[in-house]
């Protein structure tokens, strides 16, 4: 499942993030690449653990903690500290799959990458190219979203970023370890939760069908979740 999550950051928050990012020192994006990714990747990246990355990453994680749609879809157990990249002048990232395990350098913190997230920090009309293209059995799905919006997709997916031929594409990217490892199970829970919320809005939280379906949701979560 590929999901668009609008308004993770407000426009004011995006502007504040960009002020910090535009003043920061950027490095070769291959500093965090695995062997396969290094063959396909050409971009710039904010060094892991830099003061700018930590400050903006904390703001993003605070915003995610308040985002009900993100929680419902991801059921997050761990979130890898957000990283940041920029593409310009023909930069691109060829087709690849993300590493299964992400280790935070200098620590014992590690995340199983069940989900990948890209949070856009530049408006789509400010650059040409730079589309995130995610492949699945139904074809290729493209994302080039407004600044502050995020796309969430299975980390097991083949994906690439098309060349940026005008302007620059700036984004945050990170990985989530979900309480529910299996993508199909997680998607089913998300669909069920969405319907429960809609039914609650129509009939109220005391309706018998709402109570019954909520019980089913939690029993499925209890069966599938690692916490």
Curated annotation (Swiss-Prot):
Cofactors required: Fe(2+); L-ascorbate
Gene Ontology terms: biological process: DNA damage response; intracellular iron ion homeostasis
Cofactor note as given: Binds 1 Fe(2+) ion per subunit.
Enzyme class, broadest EC rank: oxidoreductase
Binding site for Fe cation: 96, 98, 159
Single GO MF descriptor: L-ascorbic acid binding
Start and end residues of each Fe2OG dioxygenase domain: 78-178
InterPro entries: Oxoglu/Fe-dep_dioxygenase_dom, PKHD_C, PKHD_hydroxylase, Pro_4_hyd_alph, Pro_4_hyd_alph_FE2OG_OXY
Keywords: Dioxygenase, Iron, Metal-binding, Oxidoreductase, Vitamin C
Binding positions for 2-oxoglutarate per the UniProt entry: 169
EC identifiers of the protein: 1.14.11.-
Transmembrane segments: none
Protein's name in the database: PKHD-type hydroxylase BTH_II1201
Native source species: Burkholderia thailandensis (strain ATCC 700388 / DSM 13276 / CCUG 48851 / CIP 106301 / E264)
Lineage of origin: Bacteria, Pseudomonadati, Pseudomonadota, Betaproteobacteria, Burkholderiales
